[in-house]
């Protein structure tokens, strides 16, 4: 198990997570296990780029095969209520996410939703029975006030940089022209 936890922490570093550390694979509380909302959003962003993950996470139920104890099989329902049309928490456009609860952490909810081609990720930590309403409020605000813009729509060359400009500590000589992929989107406030 410790080797797997080491891999989890290596992945945190690879994703740019700086305020999180795992000491067990379950996500349950530990003396040296902690996570920030920002880091959870980075983890979710990476997860929701994986099509297999999205297929599994957006499923409304899983049918487990028959066993000796359950000869008819067993149906398991994931806990994210915003996916389920028959619940008051349903939210059109939710792709998936992760629910959680411990006495120490309270209710936690990570959610990915898409509307008009823009994906948003929300993270609620230490919620107190308001994690779904807080998530809805964040999604409503995000979709109402922001838009996803293709910044490379007109040209693949976005900008030239002058000799005295630096980006993230790199001298301009290393960045004479910035190029964008065709599908390079940025989320901006609506005007």
What residues fall within each predicted segment?
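Domain-terminus/edge residues, biased toward the C-terminal soluble/receptor-binding domains
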Residues: 17-21, 31-34, 38-191
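Diglycine-centered glycine-rich loop/turn motifs
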Residues: 24-25
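Short, charged, amphipathic alpha-helices and their helix-cap/turn boundaries
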Residues: 2-20
């Amino acid at each position: 198990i410790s080797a797997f936890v080491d891999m989890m922490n290596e992945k945190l570093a690879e994703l740019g997570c700086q305020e999180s550390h795992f000491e067990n694979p379950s996500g349950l509380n530990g003396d040296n296990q902690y996570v920030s909302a920002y880091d959870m959003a980075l983890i979710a962003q990476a997860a929701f780029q994986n099509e297999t993950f999205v297929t599994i996470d957006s499923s409304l139920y899983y049918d487990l095969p028959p066993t000796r104890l359950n000869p008819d099989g067993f149906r398991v329902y994931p806990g994210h209520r915003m996916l389920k049309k028959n619940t008051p928490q349903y939210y059109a456009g939710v792709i998936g996410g992760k629910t959680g609860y411990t006495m120490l952490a309270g209710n936690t909810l990570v959610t990915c939703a898409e509307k008009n081609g823009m994906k948003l990720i929300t993270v609620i930590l230490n919620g107190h029975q308001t994690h779904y309403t807080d998530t809805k409020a964040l999604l409503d605000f995000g979709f109402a006030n922001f838009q996803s813009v293709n910044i490379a729509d007109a040209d693949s060359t976005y900008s030239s940089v002058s000799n005295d400009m630096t980006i993230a500590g790199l001298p301009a000589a290393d960045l004479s022209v910035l190029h964008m992929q065709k599908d390079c989107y940025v989320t901006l406030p609506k005007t």
